[in-house]
């Protein structure tokens, strides 16, 4: 399990751990997504992401996590949504990122032997549904109506550019969108 000695977990007002992640695409067509091996279960694939640090903005946290876990840099695009995992008490800000640079060696490849691999979106959904269904939801949401603009124009499915709030379990008095 990955735990850094200087790591500080941050929580929102309702006690959910604040997380950020990116769906990293090879191009703006958003047809191939990068997944990384899990630190806990190296034979399983996940979307790169992790906890936000104190005073860190969600977009900055997402870019940092992708750099550490996947060894890529890119152009940060739109906020796809804020996904809630009731079981683990996580709220994850999920962004779209178009990869512009791929590092040969990166922090998690060197320290824990993490791997990365490109998947067609449909294949990634199938792989993620087995052990990380919440991560599969990110890609399913993407397919349901977010055009591949990567933040270059307004997203029709999100009025006024508000983030869609998605729950992994029935909502418990949480608003359907967060402004």
Curated annotation (Swiss-Prot):
Keywords: Cytoplasm, Hydrolase, Magnesium, Manganese, Metal-binding, RNA-binding. It catalyses: diphospho-myo-inositol polyphosphate + H2O = myo-inositol polyphosphate + phosphate; 5-diphospho-1D-myo-inositol 1,2,3,4,6-pentakisphosphate + H2O = 1D-myo-inositol hexakisphosphate + phosphate + H(+); 3,5-bis(diphospho)-1D-myo-inositol 1,2,4,6-tetrakisphosphate + H2O = 3-diphospho-1D-myo-inositol 1,2,4,5,6-pentakisphosphate + phosphate + 2 H(+); 5-diphospho-1D-myo-inositol 1,3,4,6-tetrakisphosphate + H2O = 1D-myo-inositol 1,3,4,5,6-pentakisphosphate + phosphate + H(+). Mg(2+) 1 binds at residues 49, 69. The keyword Cytoplasm applies. Substrate binds at residues 9, 17-19, 38-40, 88-90, 114, 132. The keyword Mitochondrion does not apply. Mg(2+) 2 binds at residue 65. Cleaves the beta-phosphate from diphosphoinositol polyphosphates such as PP-InsP5 (diphosphoinositol pentakisphosphate), PP-InsP4 (diphosphoinositol tetrakisphosphate) and [PP]2-InsP4 (bisdiphosphoinositol tetrakisphosphate), suggesting that it may play a role in signal transduction. Belongs to the Nudix hydrolase family. DIPP subfamily. This is Diphosphoinositol polyphosphate phosphohydrolase 2. It comes from Mus musculus.
């Amino acid at each position: 399990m990955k735990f850094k000695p200087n790591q500080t977990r941050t929580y929102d007002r309702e006690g959910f751990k604040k997380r950020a992640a990116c769906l990293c695409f090879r191009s703006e067509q958003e047809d191939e997504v990068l997944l990384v091996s899990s630190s806990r279960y190296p034979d399983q694939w996940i979307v790169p992401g992790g906890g936000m640090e104190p005073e860190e903005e969600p977009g900055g946290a997402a870019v940092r996590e992708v750099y550490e876990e996947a060894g890529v840099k890119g152009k940060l695009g739109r906020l796809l949504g804020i996904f809630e995992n009731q079981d683990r008490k996580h709220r994850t800000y999920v962004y779209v990122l178009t990869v512009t640079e791929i590092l040969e060696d990166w922090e998690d490849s060197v320290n824990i032997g993490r791997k990365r691999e490109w998947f067609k979106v449909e294949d990634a959904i199938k792989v993620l549904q087995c052990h990380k269904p919440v991560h599969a939801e990110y890609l399913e949401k993407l397919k349901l109506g977010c055009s591949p603009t990567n933040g270059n124009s307004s997203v029709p499915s999100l009025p006024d550019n508000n983030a869609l709030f998605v729950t992994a379990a029935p909502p418990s008095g949480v608003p359907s969108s967060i402004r």
